[in-house]
């Protein structure tokens, strides 16, 4: 019964977001998918509660490269790159900003996390031109299966599987599997496989 209710809610959510999908399709033709996506997710970001989660997921399942039916996206979260992917059982907390990112299954992203599309999204080499006019390069950031990203972290490099990234950390270099990292810039403070098992 519960699964049937969830399926019905997902179907209704898709119907409700169909005007937003049409608007996205029209704007995408003129602005490109990424600019159109950011505006659409801003509008959907302000819908609170479980209803908002269902509506955001229904929209993102159509417009992103991948968004699992079990993904949860909280209030205030904005996506800026249509190439983003959210695998099964991912959770994105409130007020996050996600660029070109792949969240593998069972990833937890706490409130206020930013994942720009790598660390070189803005060029800075030409001192005679404004930074906004210098372009930049986007890179896919992968956050590995079972990883937990703490509140207000900034992730600009890949994070391995089953990691913990501390609140407020700034990840500038790739992190291997099974580590705990914290600080600015983030440094490995321990290896989870070295910890004794807890009862």
Label every model-predicted segment.
Residues 1, 198-199:
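Polar low-complexity intrinsically disordered regions
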Residues 178-179:
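Extracellular disulfide-bonded cysteine-rich modules/repeats
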Residues 102, 173-174:
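Conserved functional loop/turn residues at catalytic and ligand-binding sites
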Residues 47-60, 65-66, 75-87, 91-159, ...:
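Flexible, glycine/small-residue-enriched loop-and-beta-strand segment within the central core
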Residues 19-26, 77-78, 116-117, 129, ...:
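Short, highly charged low-complexity linear segments
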Residues 151-164, 169-173:
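Beta-rich strand-turn-strand
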Residues 1-70:
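A transmembrane-helix-recognition feature enriched in membrane-embedded lipid enzymes
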């Amino acid at each position: 019964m519960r699964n049937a209710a969830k399926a019905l809610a997902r179907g209704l959510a898709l119907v409700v977001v169909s005007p937003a999908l049409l608007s996205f399709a029209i704007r995408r033709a003129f602005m490109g998918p990424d600019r159109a996506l950011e505006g659409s997710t801003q509008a959907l970001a302000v819908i609170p509660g479980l209803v908002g989660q269902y509506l955001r997921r229904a929209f993102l399942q159509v417009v992103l490269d991948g968004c699992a039916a079990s993904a949860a996206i909280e209030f205030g979260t904005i996506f800026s790159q249509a190439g983003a992917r959210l695998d099964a059982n991912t959770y994105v907390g409130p007020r996050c900003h996600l660029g070109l990112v792949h969240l593998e299954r069972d990833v937890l992203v706490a409130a206020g996390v930013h994942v720009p599309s790598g660390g070189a999204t803005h060029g800075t080499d030409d001192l005679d031109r404004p930074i906004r006019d210098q372009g930049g390069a986007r890179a896919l950031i992968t956050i590995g299966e079972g990883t937990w990203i703490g509140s207000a972290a900034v992730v600009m490099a890949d994070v391995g599987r089953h990691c913990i990234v501390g609140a407020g950390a700034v990840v500038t270099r790739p992190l291997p599997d099974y580590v705990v990292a914290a600080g600015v810039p983030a440094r490995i403070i321990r290896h989870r496989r070295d910890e004794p098992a807890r009862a």
